[in-house]
A protein has these predicted regions:
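N-terminal alpha-helical transmembrane segments of multi-pass membrane transport
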Residues: 1-89, 96, 107-112, 441-480
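Transmembrane helix-loop junctions in multi-pass membrane proteins
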Residues: 4-5, 35-40, 97-102, 176-187, ...
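Extracellular loop-to-transmembrane helix junctions
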Residues: 13-53, 105-144, 320-326, 362, ...
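Transmembrane alpha-helical segments of multi-pass small-molecule transport proteins
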Residues: 22-27, 164-172, 193-218, 235, ...
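Membrane-interface loop-to-helix entry segments
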Residues: 24-31, 36-48, 185-191, 198-247, ...
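Helix-loop-helix module between adjacent transmembrane segments
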Residues: 32, 120-144, 150-151, 155-185, ...
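Extracellular/periplasmic helix-exit of transmembrane alpha-helices
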Residues: 129-139, 143, 239-257, 265, ...
């Protein structure tokens, strides 16, 4: 029965990605890039400045300039800094997609898939800017913090409550269940290969740790993410840079191979090019989530003086994820010279690193994937919880959701790799399609906000937004 379900998943996934999602993703990314006049390139210095040098004002100001999320713990207001707000989103982006996803893309689509991952990041970061700016615009005031996301701009921006509920359900299924099953599956495969640990045993450990973290609340999520993500990213980047430097003479040929394969110059069969493009964009979206509607859930929780500030921050996250971390995985695999068709997923990354640094490569990747994937499980959980609260803000609903997430972590540990990925591909496609429709319809508002931000910067001001600037929708902008 499992095989039959898996076959259905594969067929549905192939149809969605071959005939619908790829075209829609690319068209929307190009459209947003044009409408914003290449915001992801023009304002990259501003993105870095906002992250590293947030403006300081009084914490009781709604329009304060420090990018932060406010959380009440034990009766006291706690601040989650701009850096923590950034890494909560980055924790979800940086995960299995960076190690196993890249390897799968290369194994199935060839080295050229890496090129299409880069293209999705370069153009798709404009989509990330639009969706996160809109999430900020339509965010709501909670008792102790702001909250929001695509479900909210669908309801209050488009006036379509049903669409918001549909998106919320898809978000819960995709991130709370499907993505977390992939993360769990990859961790267990890596640890089985490195240490011989049974996946079921590892699944139990993962499930218990997940319950411990998610019942601690967003403050614990932010603390965990802000500690783990930078450490794991730096270590992995250092190893990758070391591997590339050690094989520096191979790098020009690797880059040439990526470009040649991206356009089918060396392909033996005409259909291979299509597979290359699909794999690159599919795994690129799984990794950086640009336009998918996930990062806006974290972006909406930030307290900023202008919605564009958080839009720029999240666009930077797409660059960081794909152009830096994913590229590191790709270079490790391609400079190693291992047969990319001999293995798949995380095991290909393990084989490549073992080839470069010796037998320590296997356990190193296993530990690294634990950190990457487990931080993603926590980030994914938070996105799902936001949407559970959108449908019905009840303690019982959240409690049931937490148990369901833990159950999917356990299930993901024991199902096949193909089953986990196929399930995720379908829900990811539907979620992305729903979100892209909404942000295309609302893109005019995000462009207006960008123009307002740029104008204030030209006047030497620290940009501040007020809903009086958009009187036609002012009654829907609760937080401004």
């Amino acid at each position: 029965m499992i095989d039959s379900i898996q076959n259905i998943f594969v067929q549905v996934s192939d149809f969605l990605w071959s005939y619908i999602i790829i075209a829609v993703l690319i068209c929307c990314a190009v459209f947003f890039t044009w409408r914003t006049r290449f915001v992801q390139f023009r304002l990259i210095r501003e993105m870095v400045r906002l992250l590293l040098h947030p403006d300081k004002v009084q914490p009781d100001e709604i329009g304060q300039d420090e990018l932060s999320m406010d959380v009440k713990v034990d009766g006291e207001m706690k601040h989650i800094s701009s850096f923590q707000a950034f890494v909560v989103a980055l924790a979800s982006r940086i995960g299995t997609g960076n190690l196993a996803g890249v390897a799968t893309a290369i194994s199935v689509g060839g080295p050229g898939a890496v090129f299409w991952m880069w293209m999705l990041a370069l153009l798709g970061s404009a989509s990330a800017f639009i969706e996160s700016t809109l999430a900020q615009l339509y965010k709501r005031k909670g008792k102790t913090s702001f909250y929001g996301g695509p479900a909210y701009y669908m309801k209050y921006g488009l006036g379509k409550g049903w669409m918001g509920i549909l998106f919320a359900v898809l978000m819960i299924i995709t991130f709370g269940f499907a993505y977390n099953s992939v993360q769990s599956n990859t961790i267990c495969l890596a640890w089985q290969k490195a240490f011989g640990i049974d996946p079921a045993t590892m699944g139990i450990v993962l499930t218990l740790l997940t319950l411990l973290i998610i019942f601690g609340g967003i403050q614990r999520v932010a603390k965990f993410s802000s500690t783990v993500v930078p450490v794991m990213a730096i270590i992995y980047l250092l190893i990758a840079v070391g591997v590339v430097i050690w094989n520096i003479t191979c790098l020009p040929q690797v880059l040439l191979t990526i470009v040649e394969n991206a356009f089918g110059f060396n392909q033996a069969a005409g259909g291979v090019l299509g597979v290359t493009v699909i794999q690159g964009i599919k795994r690129g979206l799984f990794s950086n989530e640009a336009g998918e509607g996930s990062a806006p859930n974290a972006a909406a929780a930030a307290t900023v003086s202008h919605p564009v500030k958080q839009g720029l921050i999240q666009a930077l996250g797409v660059f960081t994820d794909t152009l830096v971390v994913c590229s590191c995985s790709a270079f490790i695999i391609l400079v190693s010279g291992v047969d990319v068709t001999a293995s798949n997923g995380i095991q290909l990354t393990q084989d490549a690193l073992t080839h470069e640094i010796g037998s320590i490569g296997n356990p190193f990747v296993a530990v690294m994937i634990w950190l990457f994937a487990f931080s993603s499980i926590i980030g994914n959980y938070y996105y799902g919880e936001t949407n559970v609260r959108y449908i019905k803000d009840s303690k019982l609903g959240v409690f049931i959701y937490r148990l369901a997430v833990a159950a999917m972590v356990m299930i993901g540990a024991v199902v096949s790799l193909d089953f986990a990925w196929s399930f995720a591909d379908i829900t990811m496609a539907l979620l992305t399609l729903c979100n892209l429709v909404a942000i295309v319809l609302l893109s005019r508002q995000a462009v207006f906000l960008l123009q307002d931000y740029r104008q204030q910067k030209k006047e030497g001001k620290n940009p501040v937004f007020s809903k009086d600037k958009m009187p036609e929708i002012a009654d829907q902008l609760e937080a401004w």
